């Protein structure tokens, strides 16, 4: 069984909440404790190993396995009983030998070098599965299909390498060629606890423009603005509400990471730039409402967006309330 099964977890929580209520104990308290226990349990699974779904697989080669995401996949595959080899920058002279008997090759390199790296690969065994982990999918998928005539799969792990566990994490996948050959690998990822989401490469990149490029750019711009205004962070934190503190943490988190990664994500497509420009235009239109002092127009726009969100607005308010309580509990 996968370490995370949504239905199993939901059933257990519902059952324990019911028992707690019958005993006069707060169901929320019991759920909080159980979720903490489950989170620790998911993390500890990483030290125990996982079932091997394809025991006869030849060695897995991770190109760029020295990077953070490459090391994570090396760890998970090794814990699952597979033999893993690493192909790094200084190994290209031996690349043909390293991949000669590979059962799977995973390309885990920076976005701006992904297509070039795929093109540099020596010929792979006909049945070798070629996989990439880039956060853009259309161009890498086409490059893999052109470079290799065997099975091809595009993956995008929607989490950072510091996540600790794959339980409940989302892995997006784009079919390339011969899906029956890599179905076991998708199932192996599910055994690790991840949730799979299938989508076309084009749709993936369209959605990532909002989820990653626009969001990261807006966060970058806000951080840049704070720095240029030279605000006192200590004072902001002392005065902040739980929601602003959480927002500020998300901004600060961005600047604790690799700037090359975010430059690659934001600048990976001209479509990203076009979307950011439209956002900039709408920002300007909203500023126009302030300049005109037109509160009614502001309220009308607010209601329009509220209607667009529909039931999700209340759902997100409920979800965020839980997050804010947790953030406030962690406040020093």
Please tell me what each predicted stretch does.
Residues 68-69:
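Hydrophobic/small residue at the entry helix of a nucleotide-binding pocket
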Residues 96-144:
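Rossmann-fold NAD(P) dinucleotide-binding segment
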Residues 84-97:
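Adenosine-cofactor binding site in Rossmann-like domains, unifying the SAM/SAH pocket
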Residues 61-64:
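Conserved N-terminal Rossmann-fold NAD(P)-binding element of oxidoreductases
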Residues 39-58, 93-96:
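A short, basic/flexible loop-to-alpha-helix module at the beginning of a structural domain
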Residues 137-199, 205-208:
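Rossmann-fold dinucleotide-binding core
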Residues 6-42, 142, 299-302, 309-320, ...:
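Helix-enriched interaction subdomains in cytosolic or periplasmic regions
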Residues 198-331:
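An accessory alpha-helical subdomain
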């Amino acid at each position: 069984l996968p370490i995370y099964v949504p239905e199993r977890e939901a059933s257990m929580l519902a059952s324990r909440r019911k028992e707690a209520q019958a005993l006069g104990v707060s169901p929320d308290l019991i759920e909080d404790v159980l979720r903490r226990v489950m989170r620790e349990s998911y993390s500890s699974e990483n030290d125990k190993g996982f079932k091997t779904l394809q025991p006869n697989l030849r060695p897995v080669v991770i190109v760029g396995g020295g990077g953070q995401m490459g090391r994570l996949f090396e760890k998970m595959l090794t814990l699952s009983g597979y033999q893993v080899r690493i192909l790094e920058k200084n190994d290209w002279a031996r690349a043909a030998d390293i991949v000669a008997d590979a059962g799977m090759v995973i390309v885990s390199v920076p976005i701006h070098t992904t297509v070039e790296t795929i093109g540099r690969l020596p010929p792979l065994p006909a049945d070798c599965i070629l996989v990439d982990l880039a956060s853009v999918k259309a161009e890498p998928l086409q490059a893999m299909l052109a470079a290799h005539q065997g099975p091809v799969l595009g993956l995008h792990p929607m989490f950072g390498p510091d996540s600790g566990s794959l339980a409940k994490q989302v892995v997006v996948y784009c079919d390339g060629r011969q899906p029956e050959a890599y179905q076991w690998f998708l199932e192996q990822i599910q055994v690790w606890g991840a949730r799979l989401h299938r989508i076309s490469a084009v749709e993936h990149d369209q959605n990532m423009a909002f989820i990653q490029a626009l969001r990261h750019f807006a966060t970058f711009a806000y951080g840049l603005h704070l720095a240029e205004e030279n605000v006192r962070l200590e004072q902001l934190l002392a005065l902040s509400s739980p929601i602003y503190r959480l927002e500020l943490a998300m901004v600060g988190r961005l600047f604790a990471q690799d700037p090359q990664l975010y430059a690659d994500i934001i600048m990976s497509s001209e479509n990203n730039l076009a979307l950011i420009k439209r956002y900039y235009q709408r920002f300007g239109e909203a500023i126009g409402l302030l300049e005109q002092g037109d509160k009614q127009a502001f309220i009308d726009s607010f209601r329009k967006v509220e209607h667009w969100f529909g039931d999700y607005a209340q759902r997100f308010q409920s979800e965020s309330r839980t997050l804010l309580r947790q953030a406030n509990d962690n406040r020093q």
